[in-house]
Amino acid sequence: MSDLKAAALRALKLMDLTTLNDDDTDAKVIALCHDAKTPVGNTAAICIYPRFIPIAKKTLREQGTPEVRIATVTNFPYGNDDIEIAVAETKAAVAYGADEVDVVFPYRALMAGDEKVGFELVKQCKEACGDILLKVIIETGELKEEALIKKASQICIEAGADFIKTSTGKVPVNATPEYARMMLEVIRDMGVAEKVGFKPAGGVRTAEDAAAYLAMADDILGSEWADNMHYRFGASSLLTNLLNTLEVTDQVADPAAY
């Protein structure tokens, strides 16, 4: 197997196969669940709006892949600084049966100089999650500056985040290799690689993209680190490209860009 094929297979099993569109329907989510089951292995998770969790759970169970995790989003996509609402949404997501919650950090508050609200929001959302995985989206493409990206990452980790995630996919600039490196360096420098993971989202569209991101993680945190409890790709169109790279042609995912 070529290096690119090996990276494609590895990336496929680290995907949070995502649909977070205003026109999502039960039918689209059912199709997403079907796409998560591929001839070469399953994606790690699907990522959907909370209201679709029950139909997704049923579909994954019926197709024989109950191990595919269900991630959902809260405080999404704007990352407002109302802690009460973010926590209420997170509790509701848990009640719906989410396995993982991707919450948006109040990044604009941090840009305005308020570090406390972000810490408190993440801390309380993690308390609401208990053992459920909490991924925190810091919206790197809006923070832009290295100092802010690293500060947001540190705050999230100190507040109990299980993962730090680049982006919602809803702003002009999403994941970039430069932003990914900054966030991975924080995980390394804080000595939390065992318990904190990383998720680039938006803009990872090809096997070559995924291979480059994984090579960076291997370089910074070691070749054993990026397993499915420490690394995810938030993407949708990526799956089709990975399957094409692996020469799997009997299944094509929805190419809607994320």
Swiss-Prot record:
SMART domains reported for this sequence: DeoC
Alphabetical UniProt keywords: Cytoplasm, Lyase, Schiff base
One of the GO biological process terms: 2-deoxyribose 1-phosphate catabolic process
Domain of life: Bacteria
Reactions catalysed according to its record: 2-deoxy-D-ribose 5-phosphate = D-glyceraldehyde 3-phosphate + acetaldehyde
Predominant subcellular localization, coarse grouping: cytoplasm
Annotated function: Catalyzes a reversible aldol reaction between acetaldehyde and D-glyceraldehyde 3-phosphate to generate 2-deoxy-D-ribose 5-phosphate.
Family indicated by similarity: Belongs to the DeoC/FbaB aldolase family. DeoC type 2 subfamily.
Name of the molecule in the record: Deoxyribose-phosphate aldolase
Organism: Vibrio vulnificus (strain CMCP6)
